[in-house]
Structure formats: structure tokens, C-alpha cells
Design a protein with these regions (language model features):
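C-terminal structural segments of small proteins and small subunits
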Residues: 53-82
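Short, charged/polar N-terminal "headpieces" of proteins
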Residues: 1-22
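Generic preference for hydrophobic/aromatic residues in regular secondary structure cores
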Residues: 4, 41-44, 78-81
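A generic short-segment signal for beta-strand/edge and adjacent turn/coil regions
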Residues: 2-6, 48, 59
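A short, structured beta-strand/loop element
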Residues: 15-49
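Glutamate identity and glutamate-enriched acidic tracts
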Residues: 3, 30-32, 38, 60, ...
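Aromatic-enriched hydrophobic runs in primary sequence
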Residues: 5, 14-15, 35, 58, ...
Length: 82
């Protein structure tokens, strides 16, 4: 499970052979959630709303890059929010 980004205590991962729809995993303390790349909504899991908003904003900025990683399975680090 490659870590692709980390910011404000949020850790973002993507699995190689995960199920559709395209999503990424977010960890924050004891919270974990799968976030849809398309719209930044929670697929399943739970996050504090402030961290969900940050993860969704980050995903919107990097949507095309995230979708490319999902489709090619070529993972790399992505610039965090600052």
C-alpha cells in the first residue's frame, strides 16, 4: 500500500489491486476512510469533517494525476497541501 501524500496529519494511500470505483484511502489518527477520486465523497469509513474537506480539496487539485495512478498502477508521491 504505497503512501502517496502526507499533510496536516492526514496520510493518503492507494492500493494496487483495489475495487472500483476509483478511490484512495485516508488515515487520520484512529480514523480511516475511502474517498472517491471523482467527487471527494466518502465511499466508506469515517473522517472528521475538517480533514475530509482538506482531503477532498487536495483530490480536486490532483484528480487527473490520481486517476492516472489508479489506471496505470504507477504510484509516486504527490505534492501535499501547504
Amino acid at each position: 500500500m504505497p503512501e502517496i501524500c502526507r499533510f496536516y496529519g492526514i496520510v493518503i494511500y492507494m492500493f494496487f489491486n483495489d475495487h472500483n470505483p476509483p478511490h484512495f484511502k485516508v488515515g487520520y489518527g484512529e480514523f480511516e476512510a475511502n474517498i472517491l477520486i471523482e467527487n471527494g465523497n466518502i465511499l466508506n469509513g469515517d473522517l472528521p469533517i475538517s480533514k475530509l474537506k482538506l482531503a477532498a480539496a487536495w483530490a480536486e487539485i490532483h484528480k487527473e494525476e490520481l486517476l492516472k495512478m489508479w489506471n496505470t498502477k504507477e504510484f509516486h508521491k504527490i505534492t501535499p497541501l501547504s
